[in-house]
Amino acid sequence: MSGKFAKRWEEGYDQTPLTTKVKEAIRPPGPLKPRLDLAVRRIELQIQRLDKASDRFSERDKSIFARIVDAYSKHDMPRANVFANELAEIRKMEKMIMHARLALEQIVLRLKTVSELGDVVTTLAPAVSVLRSVRSGMATVFPEAETELGQIGNLLSGIIIDAGQSTGLTINFESANEDAQKILTEAATVAEQKIKDKFPELPAGLPSIGEKAPTEA
């Protein structure tokens, strides 16, 4: 780590360049490590919000599942199918939330590693890609989370730019995209298994996760 970068890491620049105001308009100023710590805290806050949303969906899931079982036991298949369709949509959102949470957890772990190793550019580039993907998935479920994740992504992008200028390192976009896709794929796989383990299967003949029952003509 160069002396210039080490100083920027812990203390920040003492001089104010002419372009400071322009830079501050697109990314927060200041030393890198506190900005990383801020990003970690903001992501952890989003994880907490996702946990609360997951709890709400879980309660709704249990309620609808009970109605499905009741309708099924009374051989009221049209009513059971209506509830099953609703439950299928809820479980898709639950899976989306779980996927986002797991991906954000991986980003937090990486950011905390960066604070120890100073490997800013190569670690943060995949993190930004993951945030963009998670953000797009949250658009229809939590618009406020979409906005916050976009701001966090901008914060990390600013850190990457500053770190690159200080160290002379450049982003390997191919490697960054591969790493980001690996994180997202692993999160999706784990999320799917967690949903299966968490919630009971529907009675035979009714839709499972991600499926919808045919509507009555």
List each language-model region with its residue ranges.
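Hydrophobic side-chain positions on well-ordered alpha-helices
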Residues: 64-71
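Long C-terminal interaction segments enriched in charged/acidic composition
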Residues: 1-52, 121-217
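Amphipathic alpha-helical coiled-coil segments
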Residues: 90-110
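A cross-kingdom feature marking charged/low-complexity
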Residues: 111-124
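Residue-level signature of catalytic and energy-coupling elements of molecular machines
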Residues: 75
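Extended, amphipathic, non-transmembrane alpha-helical segments
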Residues: 56-64
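Solenoid-repeat scaffolds in large eukaryotic assemblies
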Residues: 79-80
